[in-house]
């Protein structure tokens, strides 16, 4: 199992790693963040992983680079039966593109905006395999090779202006 986690996506990845390890799988985890300060739960992930590769954008911890570079390093040296990716949408998109190239089944856990948790509002809708799915009721895990990440990222950015204004108001207090 290749487990790829980025930023706060490492947190929900931890129990998945633990479950795969307890089931007797070899687990290699690739953790990534912009800098050392943003790598979370490293010790806990190490407890349940056979190997951990750390990637940081600035090279302040582990290797300098992206999660996909660490993942491809693993893919090129040993057989990977499945990949799990949780993190920023852009990270999951490029992890999915990488694993698709090597025909590795990949699951992504989406962090789409959710409002009501029932699918009624439609805020978390995402296109998977050409069909509309609702992250809150149909997911959050989906076949990463079927997800329209570009559409999802566009929808995730829909409230950036409001988020920025709220942050500025909060910081000015």
Q: What are the roles of these predicted feature ranges?
A:
Residues 96-97, 101-102, 123-161, 172:
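Iron-sulfur (Fe-S) cluster-binding segments and ferredoxin-like electron-carrier domains
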Residues 48, 66, 73, 88, ...:
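Short, surface-exposed, charged/polar-biased interaction segments
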Residues 10-12, 89, 111-141:
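Local cysteine-cluster metal-coordination motifs and their immediate loop/turn environment
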Residues 39-41, 79, 118, 133-136, ...:
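Short linear functional motifs in flexible/disordered or boundary regions
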Residues 166-173:
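Short amphipathic alpha-helical segments
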Residues 23, 27, 76-82, 106, ...:
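Short secondary-structure transition/capping segments
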Residues 1-115:
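FNR/FR-type flavoprotein reductase catalytic core
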């Amino acid at each position: 199992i290749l487990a790829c986690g980025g930023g706060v996506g490492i947190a929900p990845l931890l129990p998945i790693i633990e479950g795969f390890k307890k089931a007797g799988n070899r687990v290699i985890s690739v953790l990534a963040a912009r800098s050392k300060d943003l790598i979370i739960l490293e010790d806990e992930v190490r407890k349940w992983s056979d190997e951990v590769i750390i990637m940081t954008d600035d090279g302040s911890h582990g290797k300098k680079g992206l999660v996909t570079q660490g993942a491809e390093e693993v893919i090129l040296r040993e057989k990977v039966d499945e990949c799990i990716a949780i993190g920023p949408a852009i990270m999951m998109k490029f992890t999915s593109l990488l694993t698709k190239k090597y025909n590795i089944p990949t699951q992504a856990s989406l962090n789409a905006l959710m409002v009501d948790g029932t699918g009624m509002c439609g805020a978390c809708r995402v296109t998977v395999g050409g069909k509309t799915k609702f992250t809150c009721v149909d997911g959050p895990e989906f076949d990463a090779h079927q997800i329209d990440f570009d559409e999802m990222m566009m929808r995730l950015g829909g409230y950036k202006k409001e988020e920025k204004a709220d942050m500025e108001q909060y910081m000015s207090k």
